[in-house]
């Protein structure tokens, strides 16, 4: 796990508004969009309308150039390239960042997106699918999570089941058979469209079970299941919660699903001093949700202390010094004060998850159990 101060500032999601404009993402400071003049951008503008020019590749590349030159953390180490050599803004961005991509400092943190994709990913996590996640060994595939709001859960799929065969429309094929004919992931699981059906054969409790599932649009609950109290003789119970992702549903979930505040209220009322937080598959999300989570866990212990600081490159000292760009611990009505927190982590634990671990570490006894984070 890396110190978070450099990590957050290195992320640069470039969001295109109406093709030619720009805006900030949930992970980076909002850059000022350049004005697309439709003239000296390196593209052919003859015969195009002003709107078409603003939505053209040349205008998008101009936008990427302006944002990276101004805001990218390692702006002085980017490659100088000819904009006219690139057919897309993403290709141009990759070319400029090649030294940072090659040495691993930028591990795919910088990419092109749209407002709709960005908001969907970070606010609700909504997508079209079956509603489960898998992990594989050399010869086996296991269900590691089934989303309570999804079709797979409704059909009976649960964590720990082993997937052994799939019927893509012509009868069941084992994983070995699918591998032997080099079936693609899309062949096996189908395209991301509502109504796509697959029949799966699972092993559960040493028995085979066949389940048919149709893909649907779903928004996975932020918390996996209910927060738990693990009883122990002669001591207060241990608290446990599994947070899938830092999305708005962690604070304001759909009816019937728990929030982070529900979890900490439960722990507070049970006088929990030792807490387990499962971040194994949590790749991050909204800073605002991470900020609230830290308030719920150390808002009393560390009131007024910084929980994180968003730092950008040295071209923006005023931004770096502005306390409005810091997170400060604040006590909330549901805040409780654990003495010890154990985080279960893996190589998939990233971004906002690492921020929470780092932010709590000076104020709470923190340990990481499992694999190193991303």
Region roles according to the model:
Residues 1-8:
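Bacterial N-terminal signal peptides that target proteins for export
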Residues 15-18:
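C-terminal motif of bacterial Sec signal peptides marking the signal peptidase cleavage site
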Residues 22-275, 289:
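Flexible, low-complexity junctional segments that flank or bridge functional domains
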Residues 356-357:
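Secretome/extracellular-domain signature
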Residues 363-374:
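Short, well-structured beta-strand/strand-turn elements
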């Amino acid at each position: 796990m890396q110190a978070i101060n450099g990590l957050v500032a290195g992320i640069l999601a470039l969001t295109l508004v109406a093709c030619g404009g720009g805006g900030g993402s949930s992970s980076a400071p909002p850059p000022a969009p350049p004005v697309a003049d439709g003239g000296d951008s390196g593209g052919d503008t003859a015969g195009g309308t002003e709107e078409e020019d603003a939505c053209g590749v040349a205008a998008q590349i101009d936008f990427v150039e302006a944002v990276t030159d101004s805001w990218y953390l390692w702006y002085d180490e980017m490659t100088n390239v000819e904009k006219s050599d690139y057919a897309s803004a993403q290709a141009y961005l990759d070319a400029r960042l090649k030294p940072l991509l090659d040495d691993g400092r930028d591990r795919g943190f910088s990419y092109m997106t749209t407002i709709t994709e960005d908001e969907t990913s970070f606010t609700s996590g909504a997508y079209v699918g079956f509603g489960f996640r898998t992990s594989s060994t050399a010869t086996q595939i296991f269900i590691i999570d089934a989303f309570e709001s999804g079709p797979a859960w409704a059909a009976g799929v649960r964590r720990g089941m082993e997937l052994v065969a799939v019927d893509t429309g012509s009868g069941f094929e084992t994983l070995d058979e699918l591998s032997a004919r080099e079936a693609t992931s899309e062949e096996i699981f189908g395209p991301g469209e509502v109504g796509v059906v697959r029949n799966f054969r699972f092993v559960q409790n040493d028995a085979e079970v066949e389940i048919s599932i149709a893909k649907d649009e779903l928004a996975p609950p932020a918390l996996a299941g209910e927060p738990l109290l693990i009883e122990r003789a002669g001591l207060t119970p241990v608290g446990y919660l599994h947070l899938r992702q830092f999305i708005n549903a962690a604070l304001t979930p759909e009816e019937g699903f728990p929030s982070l505040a529900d979890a900490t209220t439960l722990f507070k009322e049970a006088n929990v001093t030792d807490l387990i937080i499962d971040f194994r598959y949590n790749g991050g999300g909204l800073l605002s949700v991470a900020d609230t989570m830290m308030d719920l866990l150390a808002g009393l212990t560390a009131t007024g202390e910084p929980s994180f600081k968003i730092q950008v490159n040295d071209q923006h000292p005023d931004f770096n010094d502005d306390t409005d760009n810091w997170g400060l611990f604040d006590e909330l009505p549901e805040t409780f004060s654990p003495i010890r927190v154990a985080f279960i982590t893996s190589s998939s634990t990233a971004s906002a998850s690492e921020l929470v671990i780092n932010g709590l570490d000076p104020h709470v006894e923190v340990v990481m159990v499992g694999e190193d984070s991303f």
